[in-house]
């Protein structure tokens, strides 16, 4: 029995290796995957109103917002912009902000975001991971639901040189989880769906969108909160190389 199990395991490894050898490109979400919310900045903003919220509490509460997006979209909601609005409400309430103050804070953060994105923290290991992937010969691309600023943000943060293609939903006119936004990226890269992998942090938007486009994906789950998701999860893009 042990020999049979070992043989089966070896066969699985070999099949995975052959599959990995086909991969020519890697696609990434932007916010929550390459750049993260500036929780320290947000905590300082709250302190101006006399509210003591530490950055770590805000970071952990954010999962509630992502879960709200998943609940809405997986229940059939089609309006992604509406879902993102519920994200902020659920997140801030989970962080301890009274419901009647959420709109006010949301407007303030929206103004900050429009001036200089709130997703502005590039975490340790990101540049090194992208350099390894680029040096290994992979084409790299970003596929992001955004407001037209992603290319400028990648330049500001020093990420732009790594990417061959940047797809911003505001510019191309279609947003995840619609598979068409992935098809645009594939066409510009000159690759097929089975030659690509994608990494993103919101299951209903990133993972289900990639699946609909025929692309295998990895869910970014830094704090192991997506326990209900039966899907390949990683904590950081560093885990993408070697491919798993």
Residue ranges: model-predicted function:
Residues 2-30, 100-103, 127, 131-134, ...:
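Asp-based, Mg2+/Mn2+-dependent phosphohydrolase catalytic module
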Residues 19-128, 136:
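N-terminal helical cap/lid subdomain that shapes the substrate entry/recognition surface
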């Amino acid at each position: 029995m042990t020999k049979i199990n070992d043989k089966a395991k070896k066969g699985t490894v070999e099949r995975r290796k052959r599959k990995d050898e086909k991969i020519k490109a890697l696609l990434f979400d932007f916010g929550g995957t390459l750049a993260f919310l500036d929780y320290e900045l947000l905590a300082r903003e709250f302190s101006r109103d006399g509210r003591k919220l530490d950055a770590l509490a805000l970071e952990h509460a954010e999962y509630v917002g992502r879960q709200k997006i998943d609940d809405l979209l997986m229940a059939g909601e089609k309006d992604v912009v509406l879902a993102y609005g519920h994200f902020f409400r659920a997140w801030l309430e989970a962080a301890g902000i009274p419901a009647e103050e959420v709109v006010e804070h949301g407007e303030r953060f929206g103004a900050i975001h429009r001036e200089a994105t709130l997703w502005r923290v590039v975490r340790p290991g990101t540049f090194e991971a992208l350099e390894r992937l680029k040096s290994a010969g992979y084409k790299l691309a970003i596929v992001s639901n955004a407001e037209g600023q992603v290319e400028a943000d990648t330049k500001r943060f020093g990420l732009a040189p790594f990417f061959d293609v940047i797809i911003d939903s505001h510019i191309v006119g279609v947003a995840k989880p619609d598979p068409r936004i992935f098809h645009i990226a594939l066409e510009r890269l000159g690759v097929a769906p089975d030659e690509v992998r994608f990494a993103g942090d919101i299951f209903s938007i990133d993972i289900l969108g990639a699946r609909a486009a025929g692309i295998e994906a990895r869910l970014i789950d830094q704090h192991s909160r997506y326990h209900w998701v039966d899907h390949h999860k990683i904590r950081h893009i560093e885990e993408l190389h070697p491919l798993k």
